[in-house]
Amino acid sequence: MDLIKVVCGIIFKDDLVLICRRKAEKSLGGYWEFPGGKVEDGESNEESLLRELIEELNLKVKIKQHFFDTVHQYDNGAIELISFICETENIASESTDHDQLQWVKVSDLLDWKLAPADIPIAKKLIEEFKG
């Protein structure tokens, strides 16, 4: 089974980070995740992330740096999740793929029902941003 390459944005506004709850009818419905999506052929990871955030959230961000990559095996295949630290001046208010958006403290991320692939990124974030 092929490895699907997916990008996500760890989007900061002030000291809060954006997480989004997947719509019930989507795979992993009800789970929270960092927003993003699949990398399309011919796109760089960064181009994919900027496109996905505009498509899903109508949100323009500034990518600050690559953060962390993780591979997760789901029942129907594996994804490589590539995360980037981003900043925004805007506030996303609605999403095409999510039914709820929440700005949360990094230290509180593991209190949410995160998608399994997002948990290692959340743990690394908490480690990096504590204190």
Protein language model features and the residues they cover:
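Conserved hydrophobic "DFG−1" position in protein kinase catalytic cores
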Residues: 11-12, 19, 86, 103
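A conserved beta-turn-beta hairpin within the catalytic core of GNAT-like acetyltransferases
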Residues: 26-30
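The catalytic Nudix box helix
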Residues: 34-66, 105
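NUDIX/MutT-family hydrolases
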Residues: 85, 94-125
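Generic C-terminal helix-cap and adjacent flexible tail
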Residues: 1-2, 126-131
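Conserved N-terminal beta-strand and adjoining loop/helix that marks the start
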Residues: 1-17, 38
